[in-house]
Amino acid sequence: MAQASMDLGILQETKCTDGIHTRALAGYSVVATDMPIRHRDGVAVYYRSSPNFAVEAVRQFGPNVVDFQLATGARRWYIIGCYLASDDTSTIESVVAAIKDQPQGAALLVAGDLNTTLTEPENDQRGTDIAAALTAEGLADMATHFLPRRRTWRTCSMVREGKVVRSRTDYILGTDCRLF
């Protein structure tokens, strides 16, 4: 992280159990969720102090959800990091609860691995429920507002039971693309 000059990030599938993880190293602070099942899921946020921003109120909001506030000059962001496993149907409820806990005056961002394609849910109830829940909260994919000249992200694609299944798993969702 330091070699890449990254001051802040959200990690997914951290697989931390029993509260065992690095909490501080090389100037970084790390807050990770504690998973009840070993070697499965989890998210973490890492950050170091910067003159350009301050990270405040980092907390765990369920086993696969962390949230924090990011103050950058006159603007304040409420950021939710999440990981929704492909067989998980309950974490979206924690994400929605965290969204409803948004502080007044803070712009909302949700960053995470949703294991579904929001624009084309895979004809399964899970994908449809996730897309509906996030759309109901007024969230939209920020990547569609910043189209590159060429495709720069990868999607997973496979044939399962004679049907092509595609997924773009990582998203940054927000309520107002004009803030970027």
Which residue ranges define each predicted feature?
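A shared catalytic/ligand-binding motif for oxyanion handling
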Residues: 1-180
